[in-house]
């Protein structure tokens, strides 16, 4: 009887863990509802990025998720968790059905988010000062859209 109960409990724990996975795939409408900064054809919830940047400059803890989608609709997650000192970054393309050998998660620790203008006049947001030595691209926004949304 004990073995049976142990088996049932183990099964329930595994099912619960899999069902509540933080990185479970969800569509862009659900991502918007959850408060993710979503980029697909356009960037949605951009004001959340602005608040995160304000919190960074004030050394206030904050967490955001930036979710992009492949052409096929598979989510790519960028999780940024600021502890008041550094940004813990996780890149997760484990739901990308066409990721090939690069499929999975990668982690890094970075110092800041920088905004740069690219050759097309768009604002690009990147993580810099990362422990692995390279800057990490987060998202790209048309400068006019950024100015319009952030002027409010």
Functional labels for PLM-detected ranges:
Residues 1-5:
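Positively charged n-region of N-terminal signal peptides that target proteins for export
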Residues 8-12:
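Sec-dependent N-terminal signal peptides
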Residues 16-19:
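C-terminal motif of bacterial Sec signal peptides marking the signal peptidase cleavage site
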Residues 21-79, 84-88:
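N-terminal export/targeting and maturation segments
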Residues 71-152:
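Extracytoplasmic electrostatic interaction patches
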């Amino acid at each position: 009887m004990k073995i049976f109960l142990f088996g049932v409990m183990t099964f329930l724990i595994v099912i619960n863990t899999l069902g509540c996975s933080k990185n479970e795939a969800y569509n862009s409408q659900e991502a918007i509802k959850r408060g993710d900064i979503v980029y697909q054809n356009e960037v949605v919830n951009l004001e959340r990025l602005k608040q995160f940047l304000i919190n960074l400059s004030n050394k206030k803890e904050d967490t955001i998720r930036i979710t992009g989608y492949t052409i096929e609709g598979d989510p790519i997650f960028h999780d940024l968790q600021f502890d008041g000192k550094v940004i813990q970054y996780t890149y997760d393309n484990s739901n990308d059905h066409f990721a090939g050998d690069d499929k999975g998660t990668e982690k890094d620790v970075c110092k800041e988010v920088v905004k740069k203008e690219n050759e097309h006049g768009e604002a690009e947001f990147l993580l810099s000062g990362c422990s692995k030595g390279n800057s990490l691209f987060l998202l790209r926004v048309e400068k006019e859209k950024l100015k319009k949304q952030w002027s409010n």
